[in-house]
Amino acid sequence: MDRTGIFAGDDPFAIAAGWLAEAEPQEPNDPNAIALATVDAAGLPNVRMVLLKEIEAEAFVFYTNYGSQKAVEIETSGKAAFVLHWKSLRRQIRVRGLVEREEGVQADAYYASRSLKSRLGAWASEQSRPLASRTSLLAEVARVTARFGTNPPRPAFWGGFRIRPLEIEFWADGAFRLHDRFRWRRNSLSDGWSIERLNP
């Protein structure tokens, strides 16, 4: 298989991390933005942009409110998919897999690294629920600010999700739409990867 250059390597997570590092100085903003897809109880899909915060040895990690629609749908199905696309590189990565919570010291550390206003905002926002007005949201921010001051703890309802892929596809633009695509697949998390080139 002619998997060379930007596609070379035996570790898909290392390839993904390398592509992200290459995109960071070139992409206009949020090179780590992913379009995260979930499905509701009726099987109707939802998709939204979130920020990918970590690429681990065997997983991709993002953070959110556990009461949000995305979190509820993830915990109902145990699955999610996302695409990471860079116009500057003309490349993308597609991921499908199983999801688990990250709510330990790793989530604490990421929460602590956020700006104070973002940490307070996590307390103030009942994400995805109806909101009477922006004024009421700002009033809640003021209330939690008075309660916690400059050291709000991580809320129990806020933390990470770790996506453990069963499938990762690397795509790069080619002339005349003759794109290069390589798909890594495994049947379970304990299996090794099989790799195949796909038609554009």
From Swiss-Prot:
Record-level Gene Ontology MF annotations: FMN binding; pyridoxamine phosphate oxidase activity
Pathway(s) this gene product operates in, as recorded in its UniProt entry: Cofactor metabolism; pyridoxal 5'-phosphate salvage; pyridoxal 5'-phosphate from pyridoxamine 5'-phosphate: step 1/1; Cofactor metabolism; pyridoxal 5'-phosphate salvage; pyridoxal 5'-phosphate from pyridoxine 5'-phosphate: step 1/1
EC number: 1.4.3.5
Keyword annotations: Flavoprotein, FMN, Oxidoreductase, Pyridoxine biosynthesis
UniProt cofactor(s): FMN
GO biological process, one term: pyridoxine biosynthetic process
Free-text cofactor note: Binds 1 FMN per subunit.
A Pfam family reported for this protein in Swiss-Prot or TrEMBL: PNP_phzG_C
Chain sites annotated for binding FMN: R48, M49, V50, L51, L52, K53, Y63, T64, K70, Q92, Q127, S128, W171, R181
Entry-linked InterPro entries: Pyridox_Oxase, Pyridox_Oxase_CS, Pyridox_Oxase_N, Pyridoxamine_oxidase_dimer_C, Split_barrel_FMN-bd
Coiled-coil residue spans: none
Catalytic reactions on record: pyridoxamine 5'-phosphate + O2 + H2O = pyridoxal 5'-phosphate + H2O2 + NH4(+); pyridoxine 5'-phosphate + O2 = pyridoxal 5'-phosphate + H2O2
Flavoprotein keyword on record: yes
Subunit structure: Homodimer.
Described purpose of this protein according to its UniProt entry: Catalyzes the oxidation of either pyridoxine 5'-phosphate (PNP) or pyridoxamine 5'-phosphate (PMP) into pyridoxal 5'-phosphate (PLP).
Protein family per UniProt: Belongs to the pyridoxamine 5'-phosphate oxidase family.
Name of the protein this chain belongs to: Pyridoxine/pyridoxamine 5'-phosphate oxidase
Organism: Cereibacter sphaeroides (strain ATCC 17029 / ATH 2.4.9) (Rhodobacter sphaeroides)
